[in-house]
Amino acid sequence: MAETQNLLLFRKWDLSDIEVVDPGLKTAISLRKMTLPYTYGRSALKRFNKADANIVERLANKMMHFGKKYAKNTGRMAGKKMGSINTVKTAFEIINLKTGRNPVEVLVRAVENSAPNEDTTRIVYGGTVYHVSVDVSPLRRVDLALRFIADGVKEAAFRKPKSLEEFLAEHLILAANNTTDAPSVKKKNELERIAQASR
């Protein structure tokens, strides 16, 4: 039991004092203690098990994929999970150097600020398609936030001299401060604006 209490993420960052502020995301963001965020896909076996996967591992998983753009996906981060984890680890060190804060806390704030509350869905009624505003479940909110962060970082870093780690660190800091300069926060606001117009 004493060993579990002393587990530090990447042997550096303590997860015990981090709190999820958004009450809707408390069940969806897992801050389970582990040294290396790698569960070998155990969370994929059951339907809602991904809620138990550490939020850092879920970010690393999202960083392995580049949306639906085939040309940008081919040959890059294709299942190279340790490469993705090392990218996140280096970005965390940059965040700590720039802000002096625990980078996992910065990630949690970034996810909270990038998670949309409303989305739209299509309803076909009498042969006509209507877009209707719907509330988003906590698990999908976290999924969308992580996707917005990963896609925004990859898009910004594509064919740029600056490294992916630096872009990820900058993006997480901006999103944690809830500034619209962060592409994930901008995307969230756009999604909620469209949903508000579809009410």
Curated annotation (Swiss-Prot):
It comes from the Archaea. InterPro entries: Ribosomal_uS7, Ribosomal_uS7_arc, Ribosomal_uS7_dom, Ribosomal_uS7_dom_sf, Ribosomal_uS7_euk/arc. GO terms for molecular function: rRNA binding; structural constituent of ribosome. It holds the Pfam family Ribosomal_S7. One of its GO terms (cellular component) is small ribosomal subunit. Disulfide bonds: none annotated. Keywords: Ribonucleoprotein, Ribosomal protein, RNA-binding, rRNA-binding. GO terms for biological process: translation. Part of the 30S ribosomal subunit. Belongs to the universal ribosomal protein uS7 family. One of the primary rRNA binding proteins, it binds directly to 16S rRNA where it nucleates assembly of the head domain of the 30S subunit. Is located at the subunit interface close to the decoding center. This is Small ribosomal subunit protein uS7. It comes from Cenarchaeum symbiosum (strain A).
